[in-house]
Amino acid sequence: MKERAAFINVSQENKLSIAYDAPTRERLSAALDFLPGVLLEEELPARKEELREVAYLFSTWGMPALGKEQIRAYFPGLKAVFYAAGSVQGFAREYLEAGVQVFSAWAANAVPVAEFTVAQILLAGKGYFQGLRRQERQGRAAFDSYSNTFPCNYHVKVGILGAGMIGSRVLEMLKAYDLETLAYDPFASDEKLQALGAKRATLEEIFSQCQTISNHIANLPAT
């Protein structure tokens, strides 16, 4: 007999259809018995009885932040939450304290984020963003004139704050370019930064020397 599972989110649409496409849902349904539709927080009281058997919850961006008592009341049989996105800081603590395991797709989510970040760094190195605003106001010649004042991405310094999953991928991808990367991360070892082609630096050094800086430090009291 299949264990019960459900999708939960703040809305019926949201990002669920992107994170869980049709083939993914088919594979999940082959192993688990899903409740119909998407659970919304406001529906939980009315569906309390059928939720008692739910062992697994699946979500992504838009995961409701339930309290520990709500979790225990509505999902007494819950074993795990699978979150198809990155950070779980907004909701995970209450589940963990209720004895529920939380799994995140933080490693997979880091791939497109790192790709996007590298693209932005390379564009910033050409003065693209400021130049575009000048072009909108003064025409293409203003863009070219401003962009030509930038050294582009050849032998310039780029600062990366944080060498976690995303920051590490960014540093690894930047090794393909003739850049000098400076990294600030008090938790990363010298060996790790060296393998990523980065030089350890202080915040003061990065902000005083680097043309472009990309921040990947979690917004937490500890960091």
Indicate residue ranges for each PLM-predicted region.
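N-terminal Rossmann-fold NAD(P) dinucleotide-binding loop
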Residues: 167-168
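Phosphate-binding beta-alpha-beta segment of Rossmann-like dinucleotide-binding domains, i.e.
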Residues: 100, 105-157, 172
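Glycine-rich Rossmann-fold phosphate-binding loop(s) that bind the pyrophosphate
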Residues: 163-164
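Rossmann-like adenosine-cofactor binding region
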Residues: 65-66, 186-223
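Short gly/ser/thr-rich secondary-structure transition/capping motifs
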Residues: 37-42, 61-63, 136-145, 194-200, ...
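Hydrophobic Val/Ile/Leu positions in short beta-strands of Rossmann-like dinucleotide-binding domains
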Residues: 7-8, 158-160
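An N-terminal-biased, well-structured beta-alpha scaffold segment characteristic
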Residues: 1-103, 208
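Conserved beta-strand positions in the Rossmann-like core of class I SAM-dependent methyltransferases
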Residues: 182
